[in-house]
């Protein structure tokens, strides 16, 4: 909605992908999205009195793979809902480049430089990579971030440590928020920084602070 207001004020439509990229790379929203997702799946996997019977009938490996598949489908559905909502509310048009409403907004309204709306898509992002690449990387990195948190929650729940699992995942999110907010080098230890594309780049120079490929390796190794 904020990005639509930005486009309306500038007088040109957004690219249809820009609202989703803005949501997926917002430091504030990337804090809330995993929290909402974890609340939605907080009871997963359900460990009831019949669980041991199901595991015995299906086999431990098949049961565990079923839980992983459920996590993947939950993540796919959650991101699809966010993506579709952004497409509908964004009222954008399709093109293969960033819109002028994003790239030239601060030049047209310098008095608003640095406010929340103008920082939804920072120059670290649109000056560095094509918009389609940004959208694809946002989807993949967010999915891997959610999957890692879900896996931690699932593993501890299977050990009957549900409270410890919730505490652990929210601690990981909180540490990511704190380190990202001050851009401490330690932020790369936590998954949040690795899921936000613009943190990987400098504002003007086409030179990465940390290659995005490193974040893919980070998630692949941990998962």
Tell me what each language-model feature is.
Residues 60, 162-163:
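Membrane-helix interface/capping residues of multi-pass secondary transporters
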Residues 40-56, 60:
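Transmembrane helix boundary and interhelical loop/hinge segments in multi-pass membrane proteins
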Residues 1-8, 177-182:
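Alpha-helical transmembrane segments of multi-pass membrane proteins
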Residues 4-41, 65-154, 158, 192-219:
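Secretory targeting signals
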Residues 163-177:
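Central hydrophobic cores of alpha-helical transmembrane segments
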Residues 175-202:
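Extended hydrophobic/aromatic segments used for targeting, binding, or gating
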Residues 57, 159-160:
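Helix-loop interface residues and adjacent transmembrane-helix termini in multi-pass membrane transporters
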């Amino acid at each position: 909605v904020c990005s639509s207001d930005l486009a309306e004020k500038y007088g040109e439509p957004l690219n249809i992908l820009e609202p989703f990229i803005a949501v997926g790379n917002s430091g504030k929203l990337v804090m809330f999205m995993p929290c909402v997702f974890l609340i939605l799946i907080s009871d997963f996997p359900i460990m009831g009195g019949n669980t041991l019977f199901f595991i015995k009938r299906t086999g431990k490996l098949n049961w565990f793979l079923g839980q992983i598949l459920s996590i993947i489908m939950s993540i796919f559905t959650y991101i699809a809902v966010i993506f579709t909502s952004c497409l509908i509310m964004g009222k954008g048009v399709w093109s293969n480049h960033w819109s002028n409403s994003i790239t030239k907004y601060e030049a047209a309204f310098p008095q608003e430089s640095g406010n929340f709306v103008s920082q939804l898509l920072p120059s670290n992002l649109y000056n560095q990579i094509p918009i389609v690449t940004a959208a694809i990387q946002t989807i993949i990195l967010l999915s891997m971030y959610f999957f890692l948190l879900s896996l931690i929650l699932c593993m501890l729940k299977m050990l009957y440590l549900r409270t410890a699992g919730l505490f652990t995942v929210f601690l990981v999110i909180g540490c990511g928020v704190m380190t990202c907010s001050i851009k401490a080098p330690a932020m790369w230890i936590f998954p949040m920084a690795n899921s936000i594309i613009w943190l990987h780049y400098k504002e003007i120079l086409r030179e990465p602070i940390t290659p995005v490929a490193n974040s893919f390796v980070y998630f692949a190794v941990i998962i």
